[in-house]
UniProtKB/Swiss-Prot annotation:
The lineage of its organism: Bacteria, Bacillati, Bacillota, Bacilli, Bacillales. Pathway: Amino-acid biosynthesis; L-methionine biosynthesis via salvage pathway; L-methionine from S-methyl-5-thio-alpha-D-ribose 1-phosphate: step 1/6. This is Methylthioribose-1-phosphate isomerase. Its EC number is 5.3.1.23. Keywords: Amino-acid biosynthesis, Isomerase, Methionine biosynthesis.
Length: 351
């Protein structure tokens, strides 16, 4: 028996503007913001109004399509110059999320051979829509594959928000919860609150409750105790960048969970599309880790909680070594074991 599941969306194309779900306002209010310039798109990404690697790539693609419609030049060479400038500009918004650069490169390549501005504008809009549509199909496929790792009644721990609002639809790490709901397979999510921005507490709990999926919120430092006492069967997380050997960059605190999974002998899965892989980098040591503003740590909802002037280290991501990962779940299936060989083989088959 199948069930219709309500799944919120984060990015919508309006033809002359982009509507984005302001994730910074959740769960208190559901507000959509209209973006009409490339600068507004950049700021929306930086301010985490749009977040999640696939969603960032989608909004960047739409942002470039939008910007191209505003160029006043009549010459294709000048058009390309302005477009490349905007591509480079958007690339400075979130350096760790590889989907951002994947989407930018795909948009750039789509008009390499185009000779008229009107045709270029048309192709850019079509390509951005295609990126969004493909991501929805990819996320559903990830969910189908991930669901084979779990059984009815499983308790599954996750961190941050790798759900529908971080992608076109369904999400990556949360996709099996949605697909399971559709198919009558009950999965119970345990969501780490995810300091300092609380994506787990604000976003994962919100979207799963919207869909009627069981979710229990825990503080980040409860994870070990929860695994020990709540019969956690597995851990599943998303990814912002996976390199050639399987080392994975994801929200800060992810490696903590991988170490706990190893200690308690439960599976630790990474769920991500092929667009999140960066096979130009051989190990996680090559990944640039974004460091964010100290006020994310020293203030909570605008209120100072640490002495003024306190030194803060606030990396947005950490890198989980491949040896701690049970399997990487992609739209093409689940890879495990010799990640360097399996990832290379996967990309050979898709090239």
């Amino acid at each position: 028996m199948s069930t219709v599941v309500t799944i919120p969306r984060s990015v919508s194309w309006k033809g002359d503007a982009i509507a984005v779900l302001k994730q910074t306002k959740l769960p208190h209010s559901t507000e959509y913001k209209t973006l009409t310039t490339i600068e507004e798109v950049w700021k929306s990404i930086v301010m985490l109004e749009v977040r999640g690697a696939p969603a960032i790539g989608i909004v960047a693609a739409f942002g470039l399509a939008l910007a191209s419609k505003k160029y006043t030049t009549l010459h294709i060479e000048e058009f390309q110059k302005k477009f490349n400038r905007d591509c480079n500009y958007l690339g400075t918004s979130r350096p760790t999320a590889v989907n951002l650069f994947w989407a930018i490169d795909r948009m750039r390549e789509s008009i390499q051979e185009i000779t008229t501005i009107k045709e270029a504008q048309k192709i850019l809009e079509e390509e951005a829509l295609r990126i969004q549509q493909e991501d929805e199909a990819v996320c559903r496929s990830i969910g189908e594959h991930a669901l084979t790792c779990f059984k009815d009644g499983d308790n599954i721990l996750t961190i941050c928000n790798a759900g529908s609002i971080a992608t076109a639809r369904y999400g990556t790490a949360l996709a099996p919860f949605y697909i399971g709901k559709e198919k009558g397979v009950r999965l119970h999510a345990y969501a780490c609150e995810t300091r300092p921005v609380l994506q787990g507490g604000r976003l994962t709990t919100w979207e799963l409750k919207q869909a009627g999926i069981d979710v229990t919120l825990i503080t980040d430092n409860t994870a070990a105790h929860a695994i020990q006492t709540k019969e956690i069967n597995a851990i599943i997380v998303g990814a912002d960048r996976i390199v050639a050997n399987g080392d994975t960059a994801n929200k800060i605190g992810t490696m903590n969970l991988a170490i706990l999974a190893k200690y308690f002998d439960i599976p630790f899965y990474v769920a991500a599309p092929l667009s999140t892989f960066d096979i130009t980098k051989q190990t996680g040591a090559e990944i640039v880790i974004e460091e964010r503003d100290e006020t994310e740590v020293t203030k909570i909802f605008g209120k100072q909680v640490a002495p003024v002037g306190t030194t803060v280290y606030n990396p947005a991501f950490d890198v989980t070594p491949n040896k701690l990962i049970t399997g990487i779940i992609t739209e093409k299936g689940i890879i495990c074991g010799d990640y360097k060989r399996e990832i290379a083989s996967l990309f050979e088959k898709t090239s």
